[in-house]
């Protein structure tokens, strides 16, 4: 088992940072007027861990007895949609954005079924069920409108906990009907504290320089920090003392692969190279790397490699194609369009040609 899962806190009281927030959530969970929640913050800040701890606070250990089901829904055009549902007797966890623009169907049918069914466990502390919606900021506006109607109609039977990276894409009617809980990214000091506790539990030691290096290069993402720490340990599994070699921390395989895609685009700009890059992009998508993440990583890579004259063009193009990937179904088309655009403006700059207006 990964350290990330092995040492994940299970209760609000055992969380290592944002103590005031934990106390407030404990207080909320003890009342019968538990509200709908919108839990937001950057990746790796601890949103999901806190939501799982809230469920335990509401229902006790029974919320951890999970099963995974696959359910099929039918769209008005008779297209079949399949979605995985993680559930206990007390709650459901779904990611409707997995089905793209059909997420409205999931929201309408599933939430209606849950809201109209009674609580199965008669000994449960709360009479309502909780529905956890992951990546809520990726929901389409139609799905969010359906969600708003459900919140109004079935508020006695269900409570919604929405998890999002940002509130900017959540419509105002939902924001106004939820208690917004911001989970800020941990500070480097808090990340070092968590890593030190894990090392102590493992019977390991590490120099301060290594912990500082990880904490300062993990983008304040605790998940990434713990994975990096375990990666360092895996390179010398027999040693009780982790060694700081002073070398650059290893990047995840997918991130290294995206950099290889960027290098390939810098080396040659041609139709043949676009086809080669397209194949590499397919590999990333097939390994569940989100298209928006691919765009952001490519943009970050190019901004560090190319002339600053190109920066506004690339930023504008990345924003444009990110929007298109969210609106459409075939993300590979928009990724490939960004690749072609980059090759065009980069080749024009190399040849000394006048760049187009953006």
Swiss-Prot record:
The keyword rRNA processing does not apply. It is found in: Nucleus. Keywords: DNA replication, DNA-binding, Nucleus. It holds the Pfam family RCF1-5-like_lid. This is Replication factor C subunit 5. GO terms for cellular component: chromatin; Ctf18 RFC-like complex; cytosol; DNA replication factor C complex; Elg1 RFC-like complex; nucleus; Rad17 RFC-like complex. It comes from the Eukaryota. Heteropentamer of subunits rfc1, rfc2, rfc3, rfc4 and rfc5 that forms a complex (RFC) with PCNA in the presence of ATP. Two other complexes exist where rfc1 can be replaced by either ctf18 or elg1 to form the ctf18-RFC or the elg1-RFC complexes respectively. The keyword Metal-binding does not apply. Signal peptide: none annotated. InterPro entries: DNA_pol3_clamp-load_cplx_C, DNA_Rep/Repair_Clamp_Loader, P-loop_NTPase. It comes from Schizosaccharomyces pombe (strain 972 / ATCC 24843) (Fission yeast). Belongs to the activator 1 small subunits family. One of its GO terms (molecular function) is DNA clamp unloader activity. Its main location: nucleus. The gene is rfc5. The elongation of primed DNA templates by DNA polymerase delta and epsilon requires the action of the accessory proteins PCNA and activator 1. One of its GO terms (biological process) is DNA repair. Gene3D superfamilies: 1.10.8.60, 1.20.272.10, P-loop containing nucleotide triphosphate hydrolases.
């Amino acid at each position: 088992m990964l350290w990330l899962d092995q040492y994940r806190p299970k209760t609000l009281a055992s969380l290592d940072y944002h103590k005031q927030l934990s106390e407030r959530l404990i207080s909320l969970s003890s009342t019968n007027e538990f509200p709908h929640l919108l839990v937001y913050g950057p990746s790796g800040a601890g949103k999901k861990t806190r939501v799982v701890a809230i469920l335990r606070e509401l229902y006790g250990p029974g919320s951890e007895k999970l099963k995974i089901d696959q359910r099929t829904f039918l769209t008005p055009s008779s297209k079949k949609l399949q979605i995985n549902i993680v559930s206990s007797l007390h709650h459901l966890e779904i990611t409707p954005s997995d089905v793209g623009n059909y997420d409205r169907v999931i929201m309408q049918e599933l939430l209606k079924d849950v809201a109209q069914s009674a609580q199965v466990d008669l000994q449960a502390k709360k009479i309502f069920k909780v529905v956890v919606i992951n990546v809520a900021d990726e929901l389409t506006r139609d799905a969010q409108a359906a969600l708003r109607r459900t919140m109004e109609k079935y508020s006695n039977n269900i409570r919604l906990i929405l998890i999002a990276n940002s509130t900017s894409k959540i419509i105002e009617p939902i924001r106004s009907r939820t208690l917004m809980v911001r989970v800020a990214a941990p500070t480097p000091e808090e990340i070092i504290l968590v890593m030190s506790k894990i090392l102590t539990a493992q019977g390991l030691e590490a120099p301060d320089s290594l912990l500082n290096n990880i904490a300062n290069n993990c983008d304040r993402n605790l998940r990434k920090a713990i994975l990096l720490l375990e990666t360092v340990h895996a390179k010398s599994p027999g040693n009780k003392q982790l060694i700081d070699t002073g070398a650059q921390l290893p990047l995840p395989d997918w991130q290294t692969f995206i950099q290889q895609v960027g290098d390939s685009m810098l080396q040659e700009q041609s139709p043949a190279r676009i086809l080669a890059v397209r194949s590499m992009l397919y590999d990333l998508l097939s390994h569940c790397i989100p298209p928006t993440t691919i765009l952001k990583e490519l943009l970050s890579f190019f901004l560090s490699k190319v002339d600053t004259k190109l920066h506004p063009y690339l930023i504008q193009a990345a924003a444009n194609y990110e929007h298109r990937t969210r609106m459409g179904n075939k993300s590979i088309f928009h990724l490939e369009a960004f690749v072609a655009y980059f090759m065009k403006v980069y080749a024009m700059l190399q040849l000394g040609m006048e760049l187009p207006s953006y």
